[in-house]
């Protein structure tokens, strides 16, 4: 049975559990991350194995390779580090034609390299506007702060990707730039009027709908359309994307593991994972999280070591997994029922993958 899911996998090669799962539930595609890449030879072998799972059809393979800080393939595996969108935005301010020419050439080379590795899409370009004071989750990934500039540069990026036989992926429809929190961890709410959104953020995507691209949704509440649900799981917003913005191509959810979609259990797991990461570093972090940890553990975390905190957090994560799996099944169903053609699941966690494979869609 084919499932409408693009999956991440756990490591540099498929495990037996993954092979068994993907044999029973045929994936719509795969997405790779740094954890899946250790050498040129290994990467080629992995993409060959993934494509060989379903010889009867073409299986697309994706990777986040926008350029700048979003690059899963780095030298010496990749030929070079590619510039960020902001780099071309700055050139554009001085010389529009040069920026467009260099951006297209950049994506021709980037996509050509990905094709050599058996990868079909860089999950680019980012089409979100930049806004002062917004979360830096977009930041230098944006081509600029005006619709005209962003559309102009995105068309060059799309042309470069297509020139090398790649699949452009415009994101994050209908616009992520105004988010003041990172949707990997929290749920952004945009209260901007529909009239203003249509003249700015939404306009960008409306101008790009004829470019033969796929699109990735934003995990953001747009209160002027649906005050309750983020775009990915909102039928109102997906209908708006289809009927008002006019996008008729493949619509893919952003990663369903992102905690913006999961309410209180998402906030809890987000905090636990951030604390584990910080406790493993040399950064000063306890003051920022002492209240949250007191609520989670009912202890004064200043009195225990980082190692003890890490173990406590790992235990809480394990205890909360069943609740998270229930939430994951729910949002998977909601995203597909809302009108997303495909859902993206990136973690590579086998229990999560089994859960969403068994979701019944209306």
Question: Residues of each region from the PLM?
Answer:
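Second-shell residues forming the walls of enzyme active-site clefts
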Residues: 7-8, 14, 35-55, 59, ...
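Catalytic domains of carbohydrate-active enzymes, especially glycoside hydrolases
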Residues: 21-33, 117-118
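Glycine-rich anion/phosphate-binding loops
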Residues: 39-45, 92-112, 147-152, 197-198
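A charged helix-plus-loop insertion that forms the helical arch/lid used to bind
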Residues: 77-97, 142-144
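Short glycine/serine-rich loop/turn segments
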Residues: 121-144, 172-191
């Amino acid at each position: 049975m084919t499932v409408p899911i693009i999956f991440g996998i756990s490591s540099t090669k498929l495990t037996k559990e993954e092979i068994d799962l993907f044999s029973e539930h045929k994936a719509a595609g795969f997405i790779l991350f740094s954890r899946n890449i250790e050498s040129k030879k290994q990467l080629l072998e992995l993409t060959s194995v993934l494509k060989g799972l379903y010889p009867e059809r073409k299986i697309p393979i994706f990777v986040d390779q926008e350029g700048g800080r979003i690059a899963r393939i780095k030298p010496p595996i990749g030929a070079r580090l590619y510039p960020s969108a902001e780099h071309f935005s700055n050139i554009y301010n001085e010389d529009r034609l040069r920026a467009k020419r260099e951006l297209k050439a950049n994506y021709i080379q980037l996509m050509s390299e990905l094709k050599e590795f058996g990868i079909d899409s860089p999950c680019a370009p980012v089409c979100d506007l930049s806004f002062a004071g917004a979360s830096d989750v977009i930041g230098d990934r944006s081509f600029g702060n005006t619709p005209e500039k962003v559309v102009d540069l995105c068309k060059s990026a799309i042309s470069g990707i297509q020139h090398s036989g790649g699949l452009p992926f415009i994101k994050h429809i209908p616009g992520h730039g105004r988010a003041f929190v990172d949707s990997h961890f929290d749920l952004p709410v945009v209260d901007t009027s529909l009239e203003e959104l249509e003249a700015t953020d939404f306009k960008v995507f409306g101008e790009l709908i004829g470019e033969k691209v796929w699109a990735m949704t934003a995990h953001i509440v747009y209160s002027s359309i649906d005050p309750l649900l983020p775009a990915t799981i909102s039928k109102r917003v997906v209908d708006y994307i289809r009927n008002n913005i006019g996008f008729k191509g493949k619509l893919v959810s952003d990663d369903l593991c992102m905690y913006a979609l999961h309410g209180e259990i998402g906030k809890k797991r987000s905090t636990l994972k951030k604390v584990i990461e910080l406790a493993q570093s040399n950064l000063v972090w306890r003051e920022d999280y002492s209240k949250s940890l007191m609520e989670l553990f009912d202890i004064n975390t200043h009195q225990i070591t980082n190692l003890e905190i890490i173990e406590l957090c790992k235990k809480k994560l394990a205890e909360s997994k069943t609740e998270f799996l229930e939430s994951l099944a729910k949002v998977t169903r909601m995203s597909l029922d809302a009108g997303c053609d495909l859902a993206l699941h990136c973690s590579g966690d086998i229990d999560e993958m089994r859960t969403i494979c068994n979701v019944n869609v209306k």
